[in-house]
From Swiss-Prot:
Protein name, UniProt field: Bifunctional uridylyltransferase/uridylyl-removing enzyme
Inhibition and activation profile: Uridylyltransferase (UTase) activity is inhibited by glutamine, while glutamine activates uridylyl-removing (UR) activity.
Cofactors: Mg(2+)
Gene Ontology molecular function, alphabetical: [protein-PII] uridylyltransferase activity; phosphoric diester hydrolase activity
Length: 948
């Protein structure tokens, strides 16, 4: 690419450097002192030049210019080294070999931390002195701190290897002469064009596209991952390089600008190419400068700094970093558009002249047949194509119809069709948006029984979805700066539709059986699909996105052809789309008022069913690993309790009767025990335990308590893995203590376990039977059981006083660099309206090891009795909810006391010094000496935990 317009004069004074090096060389390069001085001189020139390139990057903002400047700087240093080598160190080697740049360096671009790839071209049968001369150059570069990838070959060897090795072929395609024998480089290029490139275009293109697909698969096959790889990811620099390789190989161009003259790209599309390349290079160069290494993943911990370096500012509803990342993803989308346009051009302009190309690039072939029911489109080898180039101009509705016809016929898209869609987006105006037929077709696509997400994704990538629904266009490529959401908002919405389609087809039974069961009975399927697509459409606005999204839906639904009743249903679903998830994960589902309040918001069984399905789709579409069986269990519990209330089967009387029935069932299950033992152990459990804990767990717990008592254990733990719910259960039996949860939480933090939930129960004889669920870490049960046993042992050691809590937590100093990128102001909400019996305290802040232990320690220090707790993490954010009472069992009603509780909690959440941190309890159970060896798990207990 041409770089003549760039001023390199401030990057390096070449004449001065050469003069200083020459003076040192005359003293003899074989002396260590002179060699060290030369190294220091060249190293300083390189560092100063790169620092100047960084300064100019900040000044002019051009990433491509920065990459050119660093490449030019490297050229000068290598040229100086070559001259010193052939004129002083090995004077007989002048003109014997050639130094050429390959890879990105061969394109005359170099990132600050990138490797330097060199090809040394030799004459056949080079002398040993030639190899020594090359080694001298390489060792100097290595000693300067550069990572140098190199090859030494003759022209003949290059040609021979290029015939069989596509990597070598690509490297030679990008060679650029730096210094030495220029005739060797010219010979290589001439022979390469004649012996390798001629008639091998289809082969090369197929290999490069296959290589691209594999690269995407490894990097994450979506351009909407919120921590993208700028170099290797979809829509990144390597995709642009692939376009350049194909263009250079097939069209014999040295610069992408020549593609405009050939009619492959329009002037506007070439400008898009230039802007995309310059932007991606700016991001990459800033990343390398910031991290001091070849960092290619745009991770959370550097995104904010890169946004600042590129001068992005916050706007209402979007932070500076979110605006920067939205621009990034829009550029990645542009790269995808350019890829499709180039593929279309390869077929349209070259396939007839080169029939061999047709079977290689995406099954290209110049054959087509009619598609029943349409005259606008034809089928071309399993792909939908345009019957005439002016189809869209004649009838803009065909811009929507194209996707509808592709869906009902199960066709892929011809790249030329998508190219023409992209070039016809201006035809999507208000008239088309209000067109009844266009909206009918769109609703049919959205609610298709086939693969609606695939078609919606194609519409989005082609730019149609954002033009047809401008409100959707506002969230295209929008990311949310947090560790919870894995994709951009538009990709999340399309993935949510994909999840709904799976449920609709009956394919979700293993993941969430209840939604699978409910879906066939949903009365308004269309409304549900619309709600799923639109539920986050108002993200990025100042106002609450649920309320704003409901307002957007009220406007869009009639346009889509929905009735007033359907519209109101969609509006309600979007307004409430977070409610069920938050209630299930942050509220005590055994508290009757939780269910009553939720049922008051839902009001009907139909709404309840649809809200559950929408909630499941939303959570599962957030990203891999976010959904798990434990969340599914919470949602099922909330659903069934609410269903019971809405259908009239929920009352205080029924709760008492259900508790009595549960006690009878437990007693019956222990039929092989003596009657005295059965009654004694069943009477240990209060109503909340009997109503909320499944019978099989009650049986396990009761057997566990009996075995512990027989063994004389005051303290015991039992572990069990649960692969379906993706959690591991640790049950702790201990004398009750106000700080028991603090110790358990702290011990878990010290063992590196993430608590997903805590069930706190007391028995009538003054013991605590606490069950904690920790997120599963290992897929294999045996590995997970060993981990759980380690956590259980840690809990026992801290409770027994063998280890101190502050010390063991301090050992968990795992670097949470990513979390440091986020700012979440500590929030404390104390309310008496969510429970009839307890005060509910909800805290929200940035997560860190030991946080739950510190919070519960403060609550205990404030004489608050924790009755139940819900621990929920959303990426880097934690929302913990505690149901508490004072020491006499009353709610916290005094305003001054509530204010003091809030202040203490906010202080510890913010990481400020708190007197409780050093006074965290340890050894709250009687010393082991008074209890024998009961704290250690027996073989029987381990087997019981494993078998369970």
């Amino acid at each position: 690419m041409e770089t003549h317009h760039i001023d390199f004069s401030t990057v390096l004074d070449v004449s001065a450097l050469k003069a200083e090096c020459e003076a040192l060389a005359k003293r003899g390069l074989d002396k260590n002192e002179e060699r060290s001085a030369l190294l220091a001189l060249l190293k300083k020139a390189s560092q100063d030049g790169r620092e100047e390139a960084r300064r100019l990057l900040i000044a002019d903002g051009s990433g491509l210019n920065c990459a050119h400047r660093i490449s030019w700087l490297q050229d000068q240093i290598i040229t100086v080294l070559y001259d010193l080598t052939v004129h002083h160190a090995y004077p007989k080697q002048a003109g014997v070999f050639s130094v050429t740049a390959v890879g990105g360096y061969g394109r005359d671009t170099l990132a600050p931390g990138s490797d330097i790839d060199l090809l040394f071209l030799f004459q056949p049968k080079p002398a040993s002195e030639t190899h020594k001369a090359v080694e001298f150059i390489l060792y100097m570069l290595w000693d300067m701190g550069f990572k140098v990838g190199h090859a030494t070959r003759s022209v003949e060897e290059c040609i021979r290897e290029a015939k069989s090795d596509m990597t070598v072929r690509t490297a030679i395609l990008e060679t650029r002469y730096i210094c030495g024998n220029v005739a060797l480089e010219r010979e290589l290029q001439a022979r390469f064009d004649k012996e390798i490139v001629t008639n091998t275009g289809p082969e090369f293109i197929a290999a490069k596209l296959a290589e691209r697909d594999e690269r995407h698969r490894k990097a994450g096959d979506t351009r909407y991952l919120v921590e993208p790889n700028v170099k290797e990811g979809k829509g990144g620099l390597r995709d642009l390089h692939t376009l350049f390789w194909i263009s250079k190989y097939y069209y014999h161009v040295r610069d992408p600008a020549e593609l405009v003259k050939l009619g492959v790209l329009s002037k506007q599309e070439y400008r898009l190419f230039e802007k995309a390349e310059d932007f991606l290079w700016a991001v990459r160069c800033h990343m390398h400068f910031l991290t001091g290494k070849a960092e290619e993943r745009l991770s959370f911990d550097i995104q904010r700094d890169i946004a600042a370096a590129l001068d992005y500012n916050a706007r209402p509803g979007l932070s500076a970093v979110e605006r920067f990342m939205k621009h990034y993803f829009l550029v990645a989308k542009d790269v995808g558009d350019l890829t499709r346009i180039l593929c279309a051009a390869l077929e349209d302009q070259q396939a007839k002249a080169t029939p061999g190309l047709t079977g290689v690039i995406s099954r290209f072939a110049n054959r087509s047949r009619k598609i029943p029911g349409t005259v606008e489109f034809v089928e071309d080898r399993g792909r939908i194509a345009l019957a005439n180039p002016d189809v869209f101009k004649r009838d803009p509705v065909s811009l929507i119809r194209l996707f509808f016809v592709a869906d009902i016929n199960g066709l892929e898209f011809h790249p030329d069709a998508l190219k023409r869609v992209t070039r016809s987006l201006s035809l999507i105006d208000n008239d088309l948006r209000e067109n009844e037929e266009a909206n009918r077709l769109f609703l049919s696509i959205l609610t298709s029984k086939r693969d609606p997400a695939l078609i919606l994704r194609r519409m989005n990538e082609a730019g149609v979805l954002g033009r047809f629904i401008p409100e959707f266009g506002k969230i295209v490529s929008m990311m949310q700066f947090n560790m919870y959401h894995h994709y951009t908002v538009d990709e999340h919405l399309i993935r949510a539709v994909e999840v709904l389609s799976e449920i609709d087809k009956g394919r979700a039974e293993d993941i969430h059986p209840l939604t699978n069961k409910l879906m066939p009975n949903i009365e308004d399927r269309d409304a549900l699909y619309v709600a799923v697509l639109l539920h986050d459409i108002a993200k990025g606005r100042e106002e609450d996105h649920s309320e704003a999204g409901a307002a957007v839906a009220r406007k869009l639904c009639p346009r889509f052809g929905l009735s007033p009743k359907q519209t109101e249903l969609v509006v309600w679903l979007i307004a409430e789309h977070l409610t069920m998830s938050m209630v299930a994960q942050t509220r005590d589902l055994t508290d009757r008022k939780t269910i009553i309040d939720f049922a008051d918001r839902v009001q009907s069984l139909d709404r309840l069913k649809m809200l559950l399905i929408l909630t499941v789709c939303d959570i599962r579409a957030v990203g891999p690993g976010v959904w798990n069986g434990w969340k599914g269990q919470l949602l099922r519990t909330l659903y069934y309790e609410t269903e019971l209330l809405l259908s009239g089967g929920f009352s205080e009387v029924s709760r008492k009767e259900r508790a009595e029935a549960a006690a009878e069932a437990l007693e019956h299950a222990l039929a092989d025990w003596s009657q005295k033992e059965r009654k004694a152990y069943v009477k240990l459990h209060y109503q909340p335990y009997l109503l909320s804990v499944p019978l099989e767990d009650q049986i396990r717990h009761t057997q566990f308590m009996r075995e512990s008592d027989k063994a004389g254990k005051v303290l015991a733990t039992m572990v069990r893995t649960d692969s379906f719910h993706a959690i591991t259960e640790i049950t702790v039996l201990s004398p009750d203590h106000p700080r028991l949860l603090t110790v358990i939480a702290g011990a878990c933090a010290a063992a590196g376990a993430n608590i997903a939930d805590a069930q706190i129960f007391t028995t009538s004889d003054g013991r605590a039977l606490d069950t904690i669920h920790v997120s599963r870490e290992f897929p294999d049960d045996a590995d997970e059981l060993r981990r759980a046993a380690t956590i259980g042992k840690m809990i026992e050691d801290v409770l027994a006083g063998r280890k101190r809590l502050p010390e063991v937590i301090a050992t968990r100093t795992k670097n949470r660099r990513k979390n440091k990128a986020f700012v979440i102001p500590p929030s404390v909400i104390i309310t008496n309206s969510l429970s009839n019996k307890f005060t509910v305290i909800e805290v929200e802040c940035l997560d860190r090891p030991g946080l739950l232990s510190e919070i519960t320690a403060v609550l205990s220090d404030l004489s608050l009795d924790i009755q139940s707790a819900r621990i929920t993490t959303f990426g880097e954010k934690v929302i913990d909810t505690f149901y508490v009472a004072d020491l006499v069992g009353q709610k916290i009603s005094n305003e001054n006391r509530r204010a003091y509780i809030t202040a203490r909690l906010k202080a510890v959440m913010a990481g400020e010094e708190d007197e409780m941190r050093e006074r965290m309890p340890s050894g709250i159970i009687a010393p082991a000496a008074t209890r024998g060896v009961a704290v250690e798990k027996s073989d029987t207990e381990k087997k019981a935990g494993s078998a369970a």
